[in-house]
């Protein structure tokens, strides 16, 4: 709604139009089985159906994909039940994001949201790109932390070459994920196409993610600062440039360092910590 943030009385709130509702981003950083996201899906879908009705009452045309479009497109069905199903699918695919450290919880969340969308004729897996596994409290939350290799970047340092290359990779991933986000899903072929787009975006970010992992690992292992960390980051700056330039041997070395750094103070039988880098996992949001 337009109004709550401005302190407007409830009776004067105005529902946002469909494009703005579909551009919302709702994230649960510890989603477990997805209960919060399921309720968010239901509530927002009801608001979207309401917004469609208001748009039509104002003389606009709503297409089958939920967009307010020109009148020559296929029309959205009029019955409320069908509209609710379409709205839930659109909200689930375009607006909901979730993270959990437990891989099983991630799969349960996918199943929970799939069930609430009533997408019984739709293949399972269409939320793979938005529901991810990792430690939402461990990782970078701003891209410049990675491009400057600093947890507190000033913005005044000249961007290194590897930093510019990382930014380029992120921009390419955003373009791919934007195509994925706008893609309608009707059958298994659409899901496969989405999976290919997501995999392509992940490949673009493979090296930046490895650099982010070792960066966070070294920060974690050093306790967050000190001369030891400074020396390690100087070394990482050189290795990051080599890895971005395609040196697979350096990249493999960095990945071995990651496991050691992210296993600091863990029992020997425990797997290494699993950072979650928000600007790389959800680049179109961050």
Where are these regions (language model features)?
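Basic, amphipathic N-terminal segments
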Residues: 139-280
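Signature of N6-adenine DNA methyltransferases within the class I
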Residues: 38, 45, 101-172, 276-286
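Conserved SAM-binding motif I beta-strand of class I
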Residues: 28, 97-99
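Hydrophobic/aromatic-lined pockets within catalytic cores
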Residues: 2, 41-56, 101, 114-119, ...
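Catalytic palm active-site di-aspartate
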Residues: 32, 94-96
